[in-house]
Amino acid sequence: MIDSLNTLVPMVVEQTARGERAYDIYSRLLKERVVFLVGPVEDHMANLVVAQLLFLESENPDKDIHLYINSPGGSVTAGLSIYDTMQFIKPDVSTLCVGQAASMGAVLLAGGAGGKRHCLPHSRLLIHQPLGGFQGQATDIDIHAREILLVRERLNHILAKHTGQPIEKIQHDTDRDYFMSATESLAYGLVDSVLKQRAEISL
């Protein structure tokens, strides 16, 4: 999934009626409807995640998909393409934070199906306003400034929708970096449970 780590991805060998078959670990887990969102959110990674979500929907539109997130965030447009696909497809998308879900990663974690958003005990979550920079003529800078304010408003409304927090609180909290522990994110409404053991979740 991440080019720089391709040589480090372990292979799994399975015995089939036709002999042995080797999978990389991510492809094997995809058979179990597990999708990994790891590292910075950018266009290539987002396209891979979207493609996997659409594939799993076509395989079985009535069975949950499990999205595991360990991400520092990244591109808003790339992240929103994943978010929109999660809302668009028929299967529920269960989200689970392992490590961190920061910025756009936190938005995607919160965007999972209600009652099916989880994190592990030592997860770290971060919400904040979108970052951006632009150089050019004053008029163009003004155009981009207005656009990033619209993006901030859109993201705040998404967080308010999924957390149940008032939009005013979301606006206040995202004005600066707002870190949360697993238990704090549960109280905030970003997740529905903090998991400690495998028995608490099916996958």
From Swiss-Prot:
Gene Ontology MF terms: ATP-dependent peptidase activity; ATPase binding; serine-type endopeptidase activity
EC number annotated for this UniProt entry: 3.4.21.92
Keyword Hydrolase in record: yes
Localization, UniProt: Cytoplasm
Pfam families documented for this protein: CLP_protease
GO biological process: protein quality control for misfolded or incompletely synthesized proteins
UniProt KW keywords: Cytoplasm, Hydrolase, Protease, Serine protease
Disulfide bonds: none
Keyword set includes Translocase: no
Active-site residues (renumbered): S103 (nucleophile), H128
Catalysis: reaction(s): Hydrolysis of proteins to small peptides in the presence of ATP and magnesium. alpha-casein is the usual test substrate. In the absence of ATP, only oligopeptides shorter than five residues are hydrolyzed (such as succinyl-Leu-Tyr-|-NHMec, and Leu-Tyr-Leu-|-Tyr-Trp, in which cleavage of the -Tyr-|-Leu- and -Tyr-|-Trp bonds also occurs)
Gene Ontology cellular-component terms listed: cytoplasm; endopeptidase Clp complex
Enzymatic class: hydrolase
InterPro entries cross-referenced by the UniProt entry: ClpP (IPR001907), ClpP/crotonase-like_dom_sf (IPR029045), ClpP/TepA (IPR023562), ClpP_His_AS (IPR033135), ClpP_Ser_AS (IPR018215)
Subunit structure: Fourteen ClpP subunits assemble into 2 heptameric rings which stack back to back to give a disk-like structure with a central cavity, resembling the structure of eukaryotic proteasomes.
Homology family: Belongs to the peptidase S14 family.
Job description of the protein: Cleaves peptides in various proteins in a process that requires ATP hydrolysis. Has a chymotrypsin-like activity. Plays a major role in the degradation of misfolded proteins.
NCBIfam families reported in the protein's UniProt record: clpP (TIGR00493), PRK00277.1 (NF001368), PRK12553.1 (NF009205)
The name this protein goes by in its record: ATP-dependent Clp protease proteolytic subunit
Record organism: Nitrosococcus oceani (strain ATCC 19707 / BCRC 17464 / JCM 30415 / NCIMB 11848 / C-107)
